[in-house]
UniProtKB/Swiss-Prot annotation:
Enzymatic reactions: carbamoyl phosphate + L-ornithine = L-citrulline + phosphate + H(+)
Residues holding L-ornithine: N158, D221, S225, M226
Residues binding carbamoyl phosphate: R100, H127, P128, C129, Q130, C260, R288
Pathway: Amino-acid biosynthesis; L-arginine biosynthesis; L-arginine from L-ornithine and carbamoyl phosphate: step 1/3
Keyword Transferase: yes
Origin organism lineage: Bacteria, Pseudomonadati, Pseudomonadota, Gammaproteobacteria, Vibrionales
Top-level taxonomic group: Bacteria
Family: Belongs to the aspartate/ornithine carbamoyltransferase superfamily. OTCase family.
Species for this entry: Vibrio sp. (strain 2693)
Protein name, entry field: Ornithine carbamoyltransferase
Keyword Oxidoreductase: no
Length: 301
C-alpha cells in the first residue's frame, strides 16, 4: 500500500491486516508510542472538520509523530499555487499528506506530483478512513465480518460508496436504502457489485425499508450535506420515512446502530436510539483514530 485514496485499491487481506493492526494499537498504545517518531505529517482541510481533524492530530501525537495543520486559507490547493507545486513542496518537508478535500481529482494530483504517501480523509466520492473505522467497530461485535448484513439508510454519498466497496471486498452484504433520486453513484455501485461477485458478498440498492428486515447493523448519515441550502421542510418530506428510530429497529430486528456524525438528532436519528442500547456510534467515533493510526503505520513503516 503506497497511498489510500479509496478502499477499492485494497485487497481483502490488506483490509483485514489494517483492522488487526488497529485493534493492536487500540489494545496496547504504549507499544506504538514512538512508532512515528521523527515523522511529520501535513494534514490539509478544504472542508470543516471535528472528528477527522481531532482524531488525526491526536492519533499522530500518540504514535510519536508531528502533525502540521493547513486550513483552506493556508493550504488553498490550486488557488495560491498549482497542485503540482503544492505537492512537490510538501514532499520535500513532510513524510505523508492527509487531505480532506472537495474533489477527488485534487488527491490524484497530490499523488501524481508528490513523492510521499497520500491519505484521503474525505472527498466528494469516497471516505475510506470512515469505512475502515466502521468495519473495525463491526468486527468488535461480529467475529466474521463476511457474514454481516449492513444497511445504509439515507442519501447515497461518499460514505455510502466506501461502505459498499469495503463490504464488497470483505464479502459482506451491504444494502443502501435511499429515497428515489438519492441513490449512490451508479458507476461506483457497479464496481462494488463486481467486487462482491469475487468475494461472495452482495450489494443492493433500494428505496424499500422492508429489504433490510433481519439485518445486523443499520447506518445513518446527515440528510443535509455541508453547503446544502435545501429548505428543511423539503428535506424532511423526502427523508423522514427513513429516520432511524425505535420503531424501525423493532420492525427490522436490527441489533446495532452506526452513524458517522455529525448527527442531527430527531432528524435522521432519534436521541432515543443514538443514546440507547443498540448504539455503537461513539465507539465508532473513537475507532476513527485507531483505524487511521493503522493506515499511517502501514504507509510509513
Amino acid at each position: 500500500m503506497e497511498n489510500l485514496l479509496s478502499v477499492k485499491d485494497l485487497s481483502k487481506q490488506q483490509i483485514l491486516d489494517l483492522l488487526a493492526l488497529a485493534k493492536a494499537v487500540k489494545a496496547n498504545p504504549a507499544e506504538y508510542s514512538q512508532a512515528l517518531a521523527g515523522k511529520s505529517i501535513v494534514t490539509i482541510y478544504e472542508k470543516p472538520s471535528l472528528r477527522t481533524r481531532v482524531t488525526f492530530d491526536i492519533g499522530i501525537h500518540k504514535l510519536g509523530g508531528h502533525a502540521v495543520y493547513l486550513d483552506a486559507q493556508n493550504g488553498a490547493i490550486g488557488e495560491r499555487e498549482t497542485v503540482k507545486d503544492f505537492a512537490a513542496n510538501i514532499s520535500r518537508w513532510a513524510d505523508a499528506i492527509v487531505a480532506r478535500v472537495v474533489s477527488h481529482k485534487t488527491l490524484e494530483g497530490l499523488v501524481e506530483h508528490g513523492s510521499v504517501p497520500v491519505v484521503n480523509s474525505l472527498c466528494d466520492l469516497y471516505h475510506p478512513c470512515q469505512a475502515l473505522a466502521d468495519f473495525l467497530t463491526i468486527s468488535e461485535h461480529y467475529e466474521d465480518v463476511s457474514k454481516v448484513k449492513l444497511a445504509y439508510v439515507g442519501e447515497g454519498n461518499n460514505v455510502t460508496h466506501s461502505l459498499m466497496l469495503t463490504g464488497a471486498i470483505l464479502g459482506a452484504e451491504v444494502t443502501a436504502v435511499c429515497p428515489r433520486g438519492s441513490s449512490p453513484d451508479a458507476q461506483i455501485v457497479k464496481q462494488a457489485m463486481a467486487l462482491a461477485e469475487i468475494s461472495g458478498g452482495k450489494i443492493n440498492v433500494t428505496d424499500n425499508l422492508d429489504a433490510i428486515v433481519d439485518y445486523d447493523v443499520i447506518y445513518g448519515d446527515t440528510w443535509v450535506s455541508m453547503g446544502d441550502d435545501t429548505p428543511l421542510a423539503q428535506v424532511k418530506e423526502k427523508y423522514m420515512p427513513y429516520q432511524i428510530n425505535k420503531a424501525l429497529l423493532m420492525r427490522t430486528g436490527i441489533k446495532h446502530v452506526l452513524h458517522c456524525q455529525p448527527a442531527h438528532r430527531e432528524l435522521e436519528i432519534t436521541s432515543e436510539v443514538m443514546d440507547g442500547e443498540h448504539s455503537l456510534i461513539f465507539d465508532q467515533a473513537e475507532n476513527r483514530m485507531h483505524a487511521q493510526n493503522a493506515v499511517l503505520l502501514t504507509l510509513l513503516k
